[in-house]
């Protein structure tokens, strides 16, 4: 009798990706985040779909429609807060996933890595547009400030910003198009994620040692399916604790005030997961310079395979690189804290030093440390 899961064209793809996939026997929980990101994406698409059924993308009614969802729609409050905090969980998983890739040298799979960087950009764009939709004060002013950054592009900047706005300021046209893009982007992300997996399955997964695991593979199911289910349960537990106990912990109180173009909030800041990039942007006094630093702070990930000077792929056996990696993590946490602080002494200088440190660590110190470690191997 033929096994349908190995013969049916569709089932065969699923089987080869999630059941009979040969996986390294030693991958740790740091390899759980890929599946967790998939769960986050599905959760966001589903909650987003139900929110879209009740939301109106019009400047006069957007804020009221979100209030209506929370007060009058059956379980609307939990759907709204799962969506808002689901974005936070999404970015926590994203940062962990990228951090894992940096630590264990997963960027050696260049196609997979580059698609991942595109996915990161797409997710950030989606989250930004989603933050504009409730049309609170921070939504409006966040949209104004961030889109305005494009005016720093020489010659075409101003025209580009007005084209994106659909007018001379952030208004009804902007909100409508942001809603349209925010709806379509997660499906583009899902398609890109499939390409990401396609490229990953061409090479197979990396593992903590960074050594080829071809000699010791185990089937994905049941070993890693059960491991992923544990990860998923912990993710959902963390999300539901956040949603049910402190749903507004990561939000901004200003967003409970309807958007008012005549009243600027004292401190305009994005959601917490963009604060590190926002701090880098603010640390440069020049507008164009700040925008370039902002883009490069993420785009620098593309250079990781080129900056890898070590003879070993993983950092598992490289203590100096490990030390620098954790300094980089601490630096990013510092930038996140600074991004949420007002622009005044001593925060300005701390932000500037942390920004310099960020680029210095990635572009200079880590490649140099790798070279030193290579020479230490000869001892």
UniProtKB/Swiss-Prot annotation:
One annotated Gene Ontology cellular component of this protein: respiratory chain complex III
Residues noted as binding heme b b566 in the record, renumbered to the chain: 97, 196
Binding site for heme b b562: 83, 182
Positions that bind a ubiquinone: 201
Family: Belongs to the cytochrome b family.
PANTHER family, alphabetized: CYTOCHROME B
The name this protein goes by in its record: Cytochrome b
Organism: Philantomba monticola
Lineage: Eukaryota, Metazoa, Chordata, Craniata, Vertebrata
Gene coding for it: MT-CYB
